[in-house]
Regions:
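N-terminal pre-first-transmembrane soluble regions of secretory-pathway and organelle membrane proteins
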Residues: 1-19
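Surface-exposed, acidic/Ser/Thr-rich flexible loop segments
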Residues: 19-104, 118, 132-136, 145, ...
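Hydrophobic, helix-length membrane anchors
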Residues: 148-180
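Core subunits and conserved enzymes of cellular information-processing
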Residues: 101, 106-109, 117, 171-175
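Extended, hydrophilic extramembrane loops/domains of integral membrane proteins
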Residues: 110-156
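Short acidic, glycine-rich loop/turn motifs
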Residues: 6-8, 81, 115
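Short C-terminal domain-edge/linker segments immediately following a structured domain
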Residues: 72-78, 108, 155-159
Length: 180
């Protein structure tokens, strides 16, 4: 479902083209606004079978935003569904951009990103402890191995890589250039 506001007023004068492909779902949204209008889109997805289920945790690894031809001034993303008090969500938007802000809510998580550039990506990476209800209702999808240690190691590696890239790009490279 897609809804829109233009300059703070709700509008139904939008056209949505949805294309399914092997890479995912592509939405194109057209509105009758004018140059300079502030357009806010709200896209609501009811998604099933998006989690990888392990014996100890359920894992979300999803790129809800990728391959855009225009940048976004601001993105707010909500993830609800499993008990947020028991899991952890990490959001990534590349090595050099401002880190997304993740806030735990009573029903899930709120992710906020400022200035996501054209062709930028937003990755959501989360885990929740496996529950007996989730296990019982999804036996066919359950992987018979643990994953929490690997998940946490991957997050630590991402954080370390980001710090290293930023150090090289913002500290070492400028020092090398200044030394010539």
């Amino acid at each position: 479902k897609v809804s829109a506001t233009v300059n703070g007023k709700e509008t139904t004068d939008i056209t949505v083209e949805k294309t399914d492909s092997y890479e995912g779902v592509k939405l194109k949204v057209y509105n009758s606004g004018s140059d300079g209008d502030r357009v806010v889109l709200k896209v609501t997805w009811q998604i099933q079978h998006l989690l990888n289920l392990y014996s100890d945790i359920a894992v979300l690894n999803w790129f809800p935003i990728s391959d855009w031809d225009k940048g976004f001034g601001q993105v707010d993303f909500t993830v609800d569904g499993l008990d947020a008090s028991q899991g952890e969500l990490y959001a990534h938007a590349g090595y050099f951009g401002k880190d997304p802000q993740v806030k735990r809510t009573s029903t899930g998580y709120q992710v906020h990103v400022d200035n996501l550039p054209a062709s930028g990506k937003l990755e959501l990476h989360a885990y929740w402890p496996m529950t007996s209800a989730l296990r019982e209702n999804n036996q066919a999808y359950l992987l018979n191995k643990t994953n929490k240690a690997d998940f946490l190691k991957k997050e630590a590696d991402i954080k370390k890589s980001k710090e290293n890239f930023r150090r090289i790009f913002y500290v070492i490279l400028p020092l090398v250039i200044l030394s010539f």
